[in-house]
Amino acid sequence: MQISVSKQIHADFAHQHGFLGEGIGIAYLDTGLFPHKDFSPHSTRIAKFVDFVHSKSFSYDDNGHGTHITGIAASSATFGSDYLGIAPKSHIVSLKVLDASGNGVQSAFLQGLDWIHEHHRSYQIRIVNISIGSPSSEDSSASKELLKHVNALWMMVLLFVLPVETMVQNHTVFQFLVIVQKSSLLVPATIIFK
């Protein structure tokens, strides 16, 4: 028997008290978003889609991971209450920074962070979901650049949802250790970034 994430974490208690994510924008830096029925009506739920990989103007997900993660958070349960998201009335800001293989480059990720910094007020973004791990890197300049961008978002008191994973085959989460001291939520994850 499968139990939805919402039921596992008892989000139904929050839902019963009217906490459904209404008026909250969640930005997802991932593989994109397929405009699934569970994100209806698309005109209001999918507030923005930006493609930093192929520069397409329409919402799509050529991998599936971004749509899956967005569904956990924001599904409106068109296919039954087992699929109700944690914040089913939140609006979605999907920033495609990973390709069909789940791979990406840091420059696309940084563009996504910059976009959030510039547009967070317009889209009422309060939560940033970062489903990205990366190989260990000795390039300290790349790490410093990444932390500079993330620091700029921390100052806006956004909640970060980050993957936690153990080192496997020399892979690790982006070096976001400082975020743990700030506003963040750490979740179990597997590696999708190579």
Protein language model regions, located:
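Pocket-edge structural micro-motifs
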Residues: 71, 187-188
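Short, acidic/turn-prone active-site loops that include or flank metal/cofactor-
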Residues: 50-58, 188-192
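Short coil-to-helix leader/linker segments, especially the first N-terminal amphipathic alpha-helix
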Residues: 1-12
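Generic N-terminal leader segments that precede the first folded domain
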Residues: 1-2, 39, 51
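Subtilisin-like serine protease catalytic core
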Residues: 13-28, 32-48, 56-107, 121-126, ...
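Substrate-binding/access-modulating region of protease and related hydrolase catalytic domains
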Residues: 76, 97-182, 188-193
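Short, charged, surface-exposed secondary-structure boundary motifs
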Residues: 1-3, 56-61, 194
